């Protein structure tokens, strides 16, 4: 099944309030802000009108503006909290575009923290969608060292030789 790329909304969620690595979404990676990798790959597939960077951060807005991208809206504070889910952010973005009369058939989530994806990765995933498959999720094999556990104090972390350390 051939997908019309203009029926695809590419959403790049980029919250400004990272706790473990402040401003991680705009930190340079190989001389380029991390978020720009996701924006660039989306631009290889579609035009800016089908790309939504959902952010609450003026710094992120400034960085992507320097790349010539106009952020369509600033994410509401309640969707930039530690308790807001990615699903909440995606629903907000889809509803924003619906109010503008743009009803996308497909949604591609581009996490800023996955900068190594290629155009072919996305087109290959989109080619998997058909009448019997309406959702595709990319995953990777997990290593035992990455398994998250919860202590009796309800802290989330990873167990390293019977000691707790923050999960990375």
Predicted feature descriptions by range:
Residues 34-50, 62:
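A short, N-terminal amphipathic alpha-helix
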């Amino acid at each position: 099944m051939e997908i019309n790329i203009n029926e695809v909304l590419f959403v790049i969620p980029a919250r400004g309030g990272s706790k473990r690595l402040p401003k991680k979404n705009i930190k340079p990676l190989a001389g380029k802000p991390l978020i720009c990798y996701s924006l660039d790959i989306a631009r290889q597939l579609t035009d800016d009108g089908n790309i939504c960077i959902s952010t609450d951060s003026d710094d992120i807005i400034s960085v992507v503006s320097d790349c010539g991208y106009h952020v369509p809206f600033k994410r509401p504070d309640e969707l930039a909290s530690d308790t807001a889910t990615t699903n909440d952010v995606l629903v907000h973005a889809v509803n924003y575009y619906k109010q503008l009369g743009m009803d996308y058939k497909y949604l591609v989530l581009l996490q800023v923290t996955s900068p190594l994806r290629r155009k072919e990765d996305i087109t290959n995933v989109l080619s998997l969608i058909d009448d019997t498959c309406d959702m595709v999720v990319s995953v990777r094999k997990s290593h035992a060292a990455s398994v998250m556990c919860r202590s009796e104090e309800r802290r989330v972390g990873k167990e390293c030789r019977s000691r707790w350390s923050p999960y990375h």
